[in-house]
Each structure stands twice: as C-alpha cells, then as structure tokens.
C-alpha cells in the first residue's frame, strides 16, 4: 500500500478517520463499481453513516449533531473518498452535510428545531441544492427563476440545471429571485433561499424532472428541473428576503476545502491502483513498474497529491480567521491544486494499465472520469484562478 499518512492529524481528526474508515471498510471496490455502472445511489452506505450520526458532523450539538468543524469534515470526507468510494461516493454524503448550512446559519428557530434533529439522525435528507440555470452557471447572480409573494406563500417559476440528488432527497434548498435584477443596485441583491418540500411539490404537479445523461458520478443523479407555480409557505424562506446570495457565500470557502480533501483522496486511490498494477503486471520477463516510464508519472502524481494534501489540511485549520479573503485564497488554492493533482494521477494510473485502463473492472477509468469532474465543480479551475489573481495578486477584476 502506498504510504499516504503524511499529514499530522489532531486527536479528533484521527478519531473521525478511524470511525468513518471502519464503516467504509464494509463497502469494497466491487460495491462502488457496480453502483456506478448501474447509476444506483448507495443507500446502504449513506444509511450506515447516518446511523452513526455522521450526516450531522457539522450540525450544532443542540440539534443532535456532532458540532465538529471543517477540520473534522476534511478528515471525514478524505477518508470516504480514499476508501474506494472516490469523489462521487463522497458526493453522496457531501450534500447532506453542507446543504443544511444556510438553515443552521439563517433559518428560523422553529424551522431549525423541527428539521435539524431529523437531518442529524438521517430521518430527513436535505441532499439537494437548486441554483444553476441554463443561462446562469458560473454567473450565479444571473438566475431568472422567480419567487413572487402571494399572501402567506411564494409562487416559484423557472428552470434549473444540475439539480442533483432530488430523487433521493426529502427537501431541497432553492435559490430564486424575489426582486428582479433590473430593480436592485447590486447584482448580488434580490436573491432569496427557500426550503422546498419535494414530495409536496410533486403532489401539486409543480415539479418536472428530466435526468441528465452524464459521463461521471454515476451514483449521483442530476436533473433539469422545471418549477411550475410551485407554492412554498412564507415561513420556509431562509433568512431575510433578497439576501440569499450572501447566505450562499457564507461557508463557501469551507466547502471548497472539503471538496479538495475528497479530490486528494480520489487521486491517492488512483496512484495506489496504478502502483499495484505496475508491480503485478509483467512484460518481457519483469514487472512494468521497474521501468522509469511507468515509475515517473506515478511518482509525480504522488508528489503533487501530497503537496495538495498538506495545503488542504493546513488551510482547514485557518477557517476561523476573520480575514475571509485570506480564507478564500487558501480554499481556492487548495481546490485548484487538488483537482490538477488528482487528474494527473488518475491519467497516469490509466496509462499504467495500458488497454486495461479503460476496462471498468480495473476501476481507474472511473477515477479518471471523476478526476476530470473535479476540475469543473463546485467551481471551475479558471474561476479559482480568477479569485487568486484578483484577491491575492492584486490584478484587475477580469469579469
């Protein structure tokens, strides 16, 4: 096994790693291979984590959560990805952890008291965040889905893309314009967040779902969703009307660090698979791993991943800093480094396997598909660099 225990963990991080790792050990490579091939959500895996309270890792203890911080979440999600679940396996849990954040920070006490304990126990899932639209991807302030107040309800109409896990979630967090863009002073104003009861939306005939056929993350289904006169009670508005965009930004850096940790775990998994195959496969009377042409790409991948890993875990310790731009710089750097390192590592693993690299039975083709995805989500590599160029290097804003 490739030595990757290169980060000095806190006692609590080690405890998280060991406890979560024990659960992950029950789900082998064949489990993830089969679920990816079938496009099947891993309910038993997620339920196993939920039973031990891990979906509430970041929820306050007063609501039944563990009350842990980003440091522990980074250790948890890295462990899941590294175990064999990969990036997509980690994503089956990731949303359950982070989509509750707006509710924790801005929701009414009545709503939090009612829902968060059920989220912490796994009895209710907020696995879905609906933001991206056909004409609003990276430019999220350009969303056109609108929510119009009608008495004690809001009526929501619009179309969203890449709304993932709506098929396995009880609730979703929806971003919609409550004030038209042309009527606000700043483009970041006029957006609000709502907690939507998915079953109620289906019963009213207000949700139309079309699944997106995609190449990566088969265990997580993504949809184009049309909201047609969806009625949401006014008390399901999260926080203050028109301030939803700022609520989304709050906690964004911490989430990117967790994404980086998941990505590093995926990359290490790919390197290990490549090394194992390089030691086992013999050509011309010797193991192919004896050749520098095989060794060097894997070694370079390992080196890049360890650098990204050190940066990510160090950045997780900085999330309490008051200087949010500094935290943003750490988070975007970690995300960028991890995605680049994981992709190069997965590509090297595929190349090491030769023709078998595209054989699903060897898993590395899945790792490559997932590693490519990490360069796109939750923010593109280019936007991460834009942030660094503007906020770290002091260059003019480019967009």
Predicted regions and their residues:
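A short, Trp-centered hydrophobic/proline-enriched beta-strand micro-motif
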Residues: 122-131, 175
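Long, acidic (Asp/Glu-rich), low-complexity accessory segments flanking structured domains
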Residues: 228-246
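Flexible, small-/acidic-enriched active-site or ligand-binding loops
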Residues: 142, 201-231
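Hydrophobic, small-residue-rich alpha-helical packing segments that form membrane-like cores
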Residues: 133-139, 154, 163-164, 189
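Alpha-helical interface subdomain recognition
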Residues: 1-84, 93, 106-111, 122, ...
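N-terminal glycine-rich flavin-associated loop
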Residues: 88-110, 137
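Glycine-rich phosphate/pyrophosphate-binding beta-alpha loops
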Residues: 96, 136-137, 161-166, 218, ...
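A short core secondary-structure module
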Residues: 157-207
């Amino acid at each position: 096994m490739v030595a990757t225990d290169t980060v000095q963990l806190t006692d609590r991080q080690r405890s998280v790693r060991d406890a979560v790792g024990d659960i992950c050990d029950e789900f082998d490579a064949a489990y993830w291979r089969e679920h990816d091939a079938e496009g099947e959500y891993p309910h038993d895996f997620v339920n196993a984590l939920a039973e031990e309270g891990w979906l509430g890792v970041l929820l306050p203890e007063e609501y039944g959560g563990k009350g842990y911080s980003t440091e522990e979440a980074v250790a948890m999600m890295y462990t899941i990805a590294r175990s064999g679940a990969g990036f997509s396996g980690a994503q089956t849990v990731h949303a359950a952890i982070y989509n509750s954040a707006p509710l924790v920070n801005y929701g009414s006490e009545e709503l939090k008291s009612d829902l968060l304990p059920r989220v912490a126990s796994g009895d209710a899932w907020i696995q879905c965040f609906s933001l991206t639209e056909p004409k609003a991807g990276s430019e999220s302030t350009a969303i056109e889905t609108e929510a119009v107040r009608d008495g004690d309800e809001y009526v929501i109409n619009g179309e969203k893309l890449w709304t993932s896990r709506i098929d396995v979630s009880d609730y979703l967090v929806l971003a919609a314009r409550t004030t038209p863009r042309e009527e606000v002073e700043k483009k970041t104003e006029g957006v609000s967040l709502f907690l939507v009861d998915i079953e109620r939306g289906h019963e009213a005939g207000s949700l139309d779902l079309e699944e997106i056929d995609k190449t990566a993350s088969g265990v997580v289904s993504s949809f184009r969703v049309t909201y047609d006169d969806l009625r949401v009670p006014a008390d399901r508005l999260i926080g203050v009307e028109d301030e939803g965009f700022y609520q989304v930004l709050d906690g964004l850096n911490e989430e990117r660090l967790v994404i980086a940790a998941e990505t590093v775990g995926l990359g290490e998994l790919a390197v290990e698979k490549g090394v194992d195959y390089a030691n086992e496969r013999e050509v011309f009377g010797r193991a192919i791993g004896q050749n520098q042409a095989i060794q060097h790409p894997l070694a370079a991948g390992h080196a890049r991943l360890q650098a990204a890993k050190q940066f990510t875990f160090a950045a997780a310790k900085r999330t309490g800093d008051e200087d949010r731009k500094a935290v943003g710089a750490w988070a975007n750097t970690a995300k960028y480094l991890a995605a680049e390192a994981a992709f190069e590592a997965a590509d090297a693993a595929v190349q090491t396997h030769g023709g078998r690299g595209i054989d699903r039975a060897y898993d590395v083709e899945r790792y490559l598909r997932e590693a490519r995805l990490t360069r796109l989500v939750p923010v593109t590599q280019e936007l991460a660099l834009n942030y660094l160029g503007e906020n770290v290097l002091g260059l003019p804003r480019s967009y």
